[in-house]
């Protein structure tokens, strides 16, 4: 059973727009999710995801906070040892992608929205 780590900046977005994918992944994989405390964390846990509460300032531009996020992602990669990482939204894409690159973990970055 492969381990998949999902990095996102809100459980409401992940649960509201990507829950079908999460449920499908749970059928054959161990799914770990890194999120800040949010409205749908409990629902994701009840479905079978292993949750890690990672604070993210979604709109902030504080480089110290962003370095902290990068370090938190590096620690998660070391602790979980996922086979692949799936990232959503800008900060998880950027800092999760960098952490995966440094840790040599394959990752898939997703951009949300209409692209306009």
List the model feature ranges, each with a label.
Residues 6-65:
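N-terminal strand-loop element at the rim of the active site
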Residues 35, 86-87:
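Short beta-strand scaffold positions
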Residues 2-5, 100-116:
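Active-site proximal beta-strand in glycosyltransferases
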Residues 87-93, 111:
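Short His-centered aromatic/hydrophobic patch
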Residues 14-17, 64-71, 106-108, 115-116:
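Nucleotide-sugar donor phosphate/pyrophosphate-binding loop at the beta->alpha transition
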